[in-house]
Structure formats: C-alpha cells, structure tokens
Amino acid sequence: MPEVQRMTLTQFLIEQRRRYPDASGGFNGLILNVAMACKEIARAVAFGALGGLHGRAGGPDAAGAAINVQGEVQQKLDVLSNDTFLRVNEWGGYLAGMASEEMEAPYQIPAHYPRGKYLLVFDPLDGSSNIDVNVSVGSIFSVLRAPEGTADVTEQAFLQPGTAQVAAGYALYGPTTMLVLTVGNGVNGFTLDPNLGEFFLTHPDLRVPADTREFAINASNSRFWEAPIRQYVSECLAGQTGPRGKDFNMRWIASMVAEAHRILMRGGVFMYPRDTKDPARPGRLRLLYEANPIAFLMEQAGGRASTGRQALMSVAPNALHQRIGVIFGSRHEVERIERYHNEQTDPDLPNPLFNERSLFRASA
C-alpha cells in the first residue's frame, strides 16, 4: 500500500480549533468520543452473524420482540449501538444530556460524571432493518448547545431548530467505515484505517453538484403522494421526451445514511415527503436526529434541504421525536420541488407509475 500523508481526525479538529483562539478543547473531545463510539459500532456491524448480533432484540418472534418509542421492532444492534453511544459519551464531561431514537426521554448524565455545555442527539443505527441482508447502515448525530443554569435537561432543551446545530455528521458502515462531519465550516469525510484504528481525512471539502439525473424515493407510497411530488416524479420518468428533456435514474436503498452519502459523493435528490398514508404524521423521518443533521451536512456542502414548503433547518421543533417530510440533495432539483409546492399543482395529476411508461397500464 503506498505511503500517503493524511491528516487524522484529531489533527483536523486541532486545526479547526486554531481558528478560534478562545475555544476550549471540550468540543474536540466530544467529537472524538462520538468517533470512538462509531468505531465500536463499526466493529460490531462488521462481525455480522459471527458476533451473534443479528436479529430482533427480545426474541426472534414478533410477539416477544422489543419495541422502541417509535413503535418499531428493535434489532439487537440497535440496542448495542444505543448503549455504546451512551457509555462512550457520558463520562467525558462535555455533555449536559443526550437524546436518542431508541429512548423515550432525554438521558441524564450520571451525577458522578462532570456536566458539560453540549447536548448530543443521535440515531445510533440508521437503516437497521437492512442488517440481516448486509446492506450499508450508519449512525447519525447532532451537537447542540445546552441551556445554562439547569440541573437536569428536559425535552425542551433539545427543541432547537437545525440552524442552532454546532456540529453534525454520520458514520457509514459499508465496505469501508467513513465518518462525514461538519463543524459549520464545510463538509469533510474521514475513512477508518482498521489497522491503526484512526480516522484519516480522505474526502476534503465535499460538494453536492447543483444538478443531477438521479432521484431517490420509495415508489410503493406513490398512491399517497401529494400533487407536487407526483408532478416532479412524473416529469423525471418521462425522461428525454418529457418536459425535463433528459433521462433520470431512480434509486432506493431504505437507509438514509447510504442515500445521503451517495448524494454527497455524486449528487442526487432524496425524497421522503409528507403524504396521506397516515394523516396524523406529517412525515416519516425524525426531525432532530435524522433530518436536521443531514440537512446541515447538505447545506454546508452546497446542497439544499427542505420540507417542500420551507427550509428544513428553519422548522421549530415541538417534540423530541417529531417526524417531518424530508427532501434534500442537489440544490436546483430541491428548489424545483419547492416551487411545485408553492404553485400548488393539480391534485388530480395521474399517478405516473401506473399510467404512461408503466407495466401496469390497462390495455385498451
């Protein structure tokens, strides 16, 4: 293997800190602890079935399976990953509290550990339903400032808009383990060297192309889509002979981290929009620890993130596990989808997947 001099994550954080002479080392320590948690999870994921961690937590049958606060069946690796984030991050003295997809209420830092000035919110293992079929999964995290002068953090402390994030990122556990991070000054990707146990800067200054020919959406929900989404997808599927004048490819991995990573690497647009499948839910993805961190990364990389109706990071949260519609990726495509929402297109637009260019079109 050729010798290449690369900056480690620690060196990168030190360089960033030098831009702010009055900054303490606490923030760097927090990010390094998050990275350590991701290394442990990467190792557990890599062992797969050999580690005995595949399958549902609580038992193999649905009747005995563990259910999280979202009403979703927990995988064994969900539980392990959540415990790893808590254990690795609680002791450092950098945090006032944590919140996770897997826990109903905020996690209080134990009294015998020092209390810090940051909050950490995370999805410990995004895409965990893909574990048993060996599809890439990941961890998503966001760092916020904690309110001053409170002993125990409450849910309210975490209800900050995405614009208040201090840092955000994800770890992708795939053929290689990558940590993709923003501290509010661009987006950088680090690859884990499994021999040295170090993250090295391999993808500096990631940028999302403004234009794309790829989109990602779960087409099985097409009958529930609102008119602007149906219009956008219909135009993409019409290809070169349609109003867009070019062909598009459609992707869907069912792992948000993997989708976001592909878009950061080569462009694209991801849509998990609000729909009518469950009118009580304004979306599927969680605002605080899924949508906002990815939105921060996209915006810092020159892309855009939106609900379709407003900038994603401008949404004022009203609950710890609030769900929301999410659209992100190449700026020009996201702006087009926003424009379709603003124009309130025809609600009776035909479903593109079951009419023109479809195997399901009724014969005349």
Curated annotation (Swiss-Prot):
Binds 2 magnesium ions per subunit. Mg(2+) 2 binds at residues 123, 126, 290. Substrate binds at residues 126-129, 218. InterPro entries: FBPase_C_dom (IPR044015), FBPase_class-1 (IPR000146), FBPase_N (IPR033391), FBPtase (IPR028343), Fructose_bisphosphatase_AS (IPR020548). SUPFAM superfamilies: Carbohydrate phosphatase (SSF56655). Its EC number is 3.1.3.11. The keyword rRNA processing does not apply. It is an enzyme of class 3 (hydrolase). This is Fructose-1,6-bisphosphatase class 1 2. It comes from Cupriavidus taiwanensis (strain DSM 17343 / BCRC 17206 / CCUG 44338 / CIP 107171 / LMG 19424 / R1). The lineage of its organism: Bacteria, Pseudomonadati, Pseudomonadota, Betaproteobacteria, Burkholderiales.
